[in-house]
Amino acid sequence: LKGKPFDKIMFTKTYEGITFDPIYTWRTGPSATDKILPTDDYPGMGDFLRGATVNGYKCAPWGIAQACDETLPKENNELLKHEIDRGSTVYNVRIDTATADGIDVMDAEKPGDIGVSITALEDMHTLLDGLDMEKIPFMMYAGTSSLRMLALVAATLKAKGKDVSKVKGVIGANPIAQLIKRGKLNQPLEKLYDEMAE
């Protein structure tokens, strides 16, 4: 410390007004760890911030989900299989902007810009051909609305005689993030909220 006051050297204050203690321990008390540790939120409870199951990741480790972003459904299908062969444990499909917006590939400004173009049910059949979705979880971020992609995946699985209830994974959407990112939505926000609530 070289003669400097302990409080000025050991306690760091950020410009937001947060003071960092020099060390945090379980015995520090309410002035430190009690403020930063969650008290009412555990895995499988509350807002599920710490996981959807009580055991968290103890029983099932985190998945390895390399994003597959080939433009054509057949190429993306081959890449999905390749990633599983190379150690991925989750099918992770990235769709292009036009697909996320529900625009036909023929009318798209930049088809395949960030992922696979899926316009029709046949495209989804090609994309999911030979994938063991009852064994390996499936992941897709669908932009503002997941309803269309969810319907296409479910229809494809049913057509192949698969039990949709045995499929694990997520076809997610985040209309707020899309609104912030692009400044507009292709559907009313209220409709998207209702869709997510169902």
Model features per residue range: what roles?
Residues 1-198:
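Catalytic alpha/beta active-site cores
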